[in-house]
From Swiss-Prot:
GO terms for molecular function: tryptophan synthase activity. The keyword Ubl conjugation does not apply. The lineage of its organism: Bacteria, Pseudomonadati, Pseudomonadota, Gammaproteobacteria, Aeromonadales. The beta subunit is responsible for the synthesis of L-tryptophan from indole and L-serine. Belongs to the TrpB family. PANTHER family: TRYPTOPHAN SYNTHASE, TRYPTOPHAN SYNTHASE-RELATED. Its cofactor is pyridoxal 5'-phosphate. This is Tryptophan synthase beta chain. It catalyses: (1S,2R)-1-C-(indol-3-yl)glycerol 3-phosphate + L-serine = D-glyceraldehyde 3-phosphate + L-tryptophan + H2O. Pathway: Amino-acid biosynthesis; L-tryptophan biosynthesis; L-tryptophan from chorismate: step 5/5. It comes from Tolumonas auensis (strain DSM 9187 / NBRC 110442 / TA 4). Tetramer of two alpha and two beta chains.
Length: 397
């Protein structure tokens, strides 16, 4: 029997191998106990402040929206230690693992940011860790592979399937099933079997809580919308969580349209997929007519995922949040524009959210609106991917 509701409406659940059920229940109990433990919370907050660098700033874009009446604020998770929002919940889960007496950590990673966050947390807390990463992503994200190894992590390239994030997830689950007694799996997004979606949301919710306090101080009112990219959906649910009850604030999660939805080469399961069971949960899932998981595509390794966290599926199903999509090219354009006009190089993942916010501003230039974009990570890891794409266009001399 679970202590917390494992479902979000019809989405979520614990569809895991029987051997893992006691482990998931143990994790849930440890999380519930830790939430009510002042010592745990004090240690977590201390690490977030003194080690990770919270709170992160809320930055008004000075140049990006000239010619419109929109104000775009960036929630600067790119300035967090490790370079992305991933560090928040990894510190929380690593502390939970220590609390449970686990002596080994495993994780999956796509863009490498979750792997880097796991590696730094394990170095800090003296835990050995193994990171599973698709072989394609290892090539796309060489700087992050080096960073992980520099901090002592063992990085395992995964050659199965499309050699991307979903394949890394599968390998991590296999490892956990075989080694659950001494190993904790730090799942990198707000997806997977209960209690992971809830744990990750709660360890990321400070993003939205800080942003709410900061925007009230800056503008004296709440934003008209908060915008975040969605792969599995951890940065977005961290931003959305505190705003869900604020009915006047639109929640906009931006999925990757890849080469275009019509091509089939995308990673937009909410808008263009059916319900299915994947990675231990019921959610929207890209699958063919036989129910097999289809390959997703995005120029952004961190969004290259065929499913989505169950709370996002639920928020979409009840109409509380909208999930438009942005193509690779639109994300590349936004990446360049923020770099050129504000001096901030965003992650390609975050560039999807920014691209949609710019569409909102420019489609109604006379509309006075305040948008908060979650700048979930920095773009250092993407410079080679972007350089290759721009050379292909002849955009770089």
């Amino acid at each position: 029997m679970t202590l917390l509701d494992p479902f979000f409406g019809e989405f979520g659940g614990m569809y895991s191998p029987q051997i893992l059920m006691p482990v998931l229940l143990e994790l849930e109990k440890a999380f519930v106990d830790a939430k009510d433990d002042p010592e745990f919370q004090a240690e977590f907050q201390h690490l977030l402040t003194e080690y990770a660098g919270r709170p992160t700033p809320l930055t008004l874009c000075r140049n990006l929206t000239k010619g419109t009446k929109t104000k775009i604020y960036l929630k600067r998770e790119d300035l967090l230690h490790g370079g992305a929002h991933k560090t928040n919940q990894v510190l929380g889960q690593a502390l939970l693992a220590k609390r449970m007496g686990k002596t080994r950590i495993i994780a999956e990673t796509g863009a490498g940011q979750h792997g880097v966050a796991t590696a730094l947390a394990c170095a800090l807390l003296d835990l050995p860790c193994r990171i599973y990463m698709g072989a394609v992503d290892c090539e796309r994200q060489k700087p992050n592979v080096f960073r992980m190894r520099l901090m002592g992590a063992e990085v395992i390239p995964v050659h199965a399937g499309s050699s991307t994030l979903k394949d890394a997830c599968n390998e991590a689950m296999r490892d956990w099933t075989a080694n659950y007694k001494d190993t904790h799996y730090i799942l990198g997004t707000a997806a997977g079997p209960h209690p992971f979606p809830t744990i990750v949301r709660e360890f990321q919710r400070m993003i939205g809580e800080e942003a709410k306090e900061q925007i009230l101080k800056a503008e004296g009112r709440l934003p008209d919308a908060v915008v975040a990219c969605v792969g599995g959906g951890s940065n977005a649910i961290g931003m959305f969580a505190t705003f869900i009850e604020e009915e006047g604030v639109r929640l906009i999660g931006v999925e990757p349209a890849g080469h275009g939805i019509e091509t089939g080469k995308h990673g937009a399961p909410i808008g263009h997929a059916r319900k299915g069971i994947y990675l231990g949960m019921v959610s929207f899932l890209m699958q063919n007519e036989d129910g097999q998981v289809e390959e997703s595509h995005s120029i952004s390794a961190g969004l290259d995922f065929p499913s989505v966290g169950p709370q996002h599926a639920y928020l979409s199903s009840i109409g509380r949040a909208q999930y438009p999509s942005v193509t690779d090219q639109e994300a590349l354009d936004a990446f360049q524009e923020l770099s050129l006009r504000e001096g901030i190089i965003p992650a390609l993942e975050s560039s999807h959210a920014l691209a949609h916010a710019l569409k909102m501003a420019r489609s109604e230039p006379e509309k006075e609106q305040i948008l908060i974009v979650n700048l979930s990570g920095r773009g250092d890891k993407d410079i080679f991917t972007v350089a290759n794409a721009l050379e292909g266009e002849g955009a770089l001399s």
